[in-house]
Amino acid sequence: MVKLHLGCGKRDFGPEWVHIDQADFPHIRYKDVTRLPYVDSEVDLIYCSHLIAYFDREQIKPILKEWRRVLKRKGVLRIATPDWNVLRRMKDPMLGPLYGKMSEPPIYHKTVYDLSGLRSVLNESGFKNVKRYNHTMTDHAQFDDHSAAYHNVVLISLNVECHV
């Protein structure tokens, strides 16, 4: 089974995952999440947590099509991203991290999604059956990443998966 962890940063899910990120950590095998080094229909699962927010809406469409290209017929794309429907109801504490400088070198969120908007861009990119997933019921639930991000007991991640 080929499982990709895109935009993984320092989070190492173990040897059964292929880690892809521009950062320099020992577990990272490839750097470019926009052009994956796989043939068509080779990958079973793609997972990314809080990665797509770094691309604007025009950039993300060809990227999603690339991810779809490498996924097998029954392949799954699993995405966690800041949930705009939740965050827009919150006041100042989350808005800085949402659109502000995130790290050194400076990287910034360029967009946020609600379920309807994310479903639309995924459908336009050829994905089907877009639905929320429970982050505690995945094969990566034991890893601390932003798919399980809570603020004042409210889950702030929009966690969706879809199929080819």
Residue locations for each model-derived region?
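Residues at the starts of beta-strands that form the adenosine-phosphate
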Residues: 2, 16, 129
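Conserved class I S-adenosyl-L-methionine
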Residues: 2-9
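Adenosine-cofactor binding site in Rossmann-like domains, unifying the SAM/SAH pocket
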Residues: 10-40, 134-135, 139-145, 150
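Local beta-strand N-terminus motif with an aromatic residue
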Residues: 43-44
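A conserved beta-strand element that flanks and buttresses the S-adenosyl-L-methionine
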Residues: 47
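Short catalytic micro-motifs in class I SAM-dependent methyltransferases
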Residues: 50-54
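S-adenosyl-L-methionine-dependent methyltransferase catalytic module, highlighting the catalytic core
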Residues: 57-66, 70-72, 76-164
